[in-house]
Amino acid sequence: MNPVFLKRFLIVLYAAGLIGMHLHATAALFTSLVPLTLWFTAFICLVYFPKPSFQAYLFLGVLAIAAWYLEVQGVRTGQIFGQYSYGKTLGFQVLNVPITIGLNWLVLVVATNALVEEWNIAGKISKAALGAGLMTALDFLIEPVAVHFDFWTWAGVQVPTQNFIAWWFASFVFHLAYQNTPFPSKSSLFRLIAALQFLFFLGHWLFLQFNF
């Protein structure tokens, strides 16, 4: 697929999802398409991975499975992120955690890493810390949207501070692992995906603030 066309398609896809999920006539349809969007985005990241190899795909697979397993333990124990449970919106679940969650962690790590690489920051630890900061900032936007659309729900009224601390540490570990491979790149496609994630959830957050 032509890279320019693909970028435009992703922009239209996320814009349509943002608007469609808030229109009464289309909300149910577009909300049901969330898992497909996550699968498609992960597929694009794999197909257009800048340095494709068996080792690269093995690493990405391990990353996705490790992230999914972390969430399994988080849901099971309530000790990592806080007490929460997943709804039905994100699709098929294994051990009470959607398969798409591991894919989403994968997408967010490689996408936010591409932003960090573009900024030419020295040192793997510094890059990992900034990448984790970007992912945690994104989680601040995701949380109210996730609860509204039944991605997941928390046992309490407020999202626990523990969640954001754990998000940063988990993201830092995944970013640092990624930094210690030859795979990080300044992929413009991955940077676009990162930007779309921020804009998508910022848009949802604004819609919810104004009760749209």
Give the label of every model feature segment.
Residues M1-F212:
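Aromatic-rich, lipid-facing transmembrane alpha helices and their immediate juxtamembrane interface loops
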